[in-house]
């Protein structure tokens, strides 16, 4: 089941990022890419946003990734919803950041101007656990070491 969960992460590129500040949740629709193992997700944000401020205050996050696009035109009971719990991390290594940036541009060419903005920051979410709702009633939970 863990591999199925990782495949959902690797096979998609849009998620909802949930952050928290002072007990108040904040959700953002985000483009993303993942590493090849499905254990880390990379996103981009301006540093002067509510979400980035929340991340700096509280690095614990949740992502929602689903298969509604894959299931378009089918019955909604087949949609899979994956809740990902993880931890925000800055990327300090310039070489790694350049590699991620190139991969991000390849997957999301429509974000070229955003990625070239000096105020934009690429960051990662290190995945800690998954909760998969497969259809309307089958739920599975997995942690990553």
Model-derived segments and spans:
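Extreme N-terminal tail/first-helix region
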Residues: 1-15
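Structural motif corresponding to alpha-helix initiation and N-cap regions
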Residues: 2, 48-49
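A generic "binding-loop/recognition-motif" signal
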Residues: 47-48, 128
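Short, surface-exposed beta-strand-loop junctions and turns on beta-sheet-rich folds
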Residues: 49-50, 70, 138-140
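Proline-centered flexible-loop/turn and helix-kink motifs
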Residues: 57-59, 109
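Charged, gly/pro-rich active-site loop segments
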Residues: 76-145
């Amino acid at each position: 089941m863990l591999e199925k969960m990782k495949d959902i992460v690797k096979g998609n590129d849009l998620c909802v990022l949930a952050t928290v500040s002072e007990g108040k949740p904040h959700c953002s629709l985000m483009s993303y890419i993942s590493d090849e193992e499905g254990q880390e997700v990379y996103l981009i944000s301006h540093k002067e946003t509510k979400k980035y401020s929340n991340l700096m205050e509280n690095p614990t996050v949740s992502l929602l990734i689903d298969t509604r696009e894959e299931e378009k035109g089918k019955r909604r009971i087949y949609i899979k919803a994956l809740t990902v719990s993880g931890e925000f991390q800055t990327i300090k290594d310039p070489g790694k950041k350049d590699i991620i940036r190139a991969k991000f541009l390849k997957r999301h060419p429509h974000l070229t101007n955003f990625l070239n903005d000096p105020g934009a920051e690429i960051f990662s979410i290190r995945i800690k656990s998954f909760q998969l709702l497969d259809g309307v009633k089958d739920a599975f939970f997995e942690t990553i070491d």
